Regions:
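Conserved phosphate/metal-binding and DNA-contacting active-site motifs used
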Residues: 1-135, 140-230
C-alpha cells in the first residue's frame, strides 16, 4: 500500500471535465443557481478576503470581519446572505453552509490526492471533491460527520495520531467554486457533483481510513520516488 502514497501533483490527476457548458467563465450567480436549483444545496453570500493576486498559498489575506488573525478569511456570510446568494457584485463569494446537505472532510492537498487515487482504484464512490487554492482538498461526506469524527477515528485506531485532518460541520462554511480566495486563486471542483452523489454524499467511514493514512504518511515521509497517477 505504501507505494501508492508517493508524491503526486494536482496536474497529474484527471480534473473534473469542463464540458460544453463550462467553456465560458461561470459567474457566482450562475454557480449559486446551479447549486440551489439543480442539486438542492443551500448557499450563502460571503464578502471575499483580499490579498495580493498571484502571491501564492502563503500570502497574507485580509478578512472583511476585521480580525487581524481570522481563522476563516472570506468564509463569513454577509447579513441577509444566508440561504441564498446575493451575488450582484462580481467579486462576491459563494459559500456552502456545512452540516446540512453534507459535511466536509478537509485535508492537505498532497494527502488528499494520494487518498483519492487509492480510493478510486479500489472502486470507492468518493463523491464531490473541492480543490482550494490554500493547498487543501475537501471531500463532501454525509451530514453529521463532524459530530461523529472523534468516535470514527477512535474506532479506526487513529485517535492518538496528530493528523492534519478536520471536518466542517454545523455552523461552518466552505468556499464554493468559482469563489476566488484573496490573492490565491479560485476554488475548483476536482470531482464534480452528479445526480448519484449530490443528494446522498458518501458516509465518511468509507473514505476516512484512507484519508487518515495518507495524512499520517505525509507527516512521516522522507525522500521517496515520485509516483505519477496514470
Amino acid at each position: 500500500m505504501d507505494n501508492l502514497f508517493g508524491e503526486l501533483r494536482l496536474g497529474s490527476l484527471r480534473l473534473a471535465p469542463l464540458g460544453a457548458r463550462r467553456r465560458t467563465k461561470v459567474t457566482a450567480s450562475q454557480a449559486a443557481a446551479e447549486y440551489t436549483g439543480r442539486w438542492g444545496w443551500a448557499v450563502a453570500t460571503g464578502d471575499p478576503a483580499t490579498g495580493t493576486p498571484g502571491s501564492g498559498a502563503t500570502a497574507p489575506t485580509r478578512c472583511p470581519c476585521g480580525a487581524a488573525r481570522c481563522a476563516a478569511p472570506g468564509l463569513h456570510p454577509v447579513p441577509g446572505g444566508e440561504g441564498r446568494a446575493r451575488t450582484g457584485r462580481a467579486e462576491a463569494s459563494v459559500l456552502f453552509p456545512t452540516g446540512r446537505a453534507f459535511d466536509v472532510l478537509d485535508v492537505p492537498e498532497q494527502a488528499g490526492l494520494q487518498a483519492l487515487v487509492r480510493l478510486e482504484r479500489m472502486g470507492t464512490q468518493v463523491g464531490p471533491v473541492l480543490s482550494a487554492p490554500t493547498g487543501r482538498l475537501q471531500f463532501l461526506v454525509a451530514a453529521g460527520t463532524a459530530r461523529r469524527l472523534p468516535d470514527l477515528l477512535y474506532r479506526m485506531g487513529w485517535d492518538d495520531a496528530a493528523l492534519d485532518l478536520t471536518c466542517h460541520g454545523e455552523g461552518s462554511y466552505v468556499a464554493a467554486p468559482p469563489t476566488v480566495l484573496g490573492g490565491l486563486g479560485p476554488v475548483r471542483w476536482l470531482r464534480r457533483p452528479t445526480r448519484d452523489n449530490a443528494g446522498c454524499p458518501p458516509e465518511a467511514r468509507l473514505l476516512l481510513g484512507t484519508l487518515a493514512y495518507a495524512c499520517h504518511r505525509g507527516r512521516e515521509r522522507t525522500a521517496e520516488p515520485a509516483w505519477i497517477a496514470s
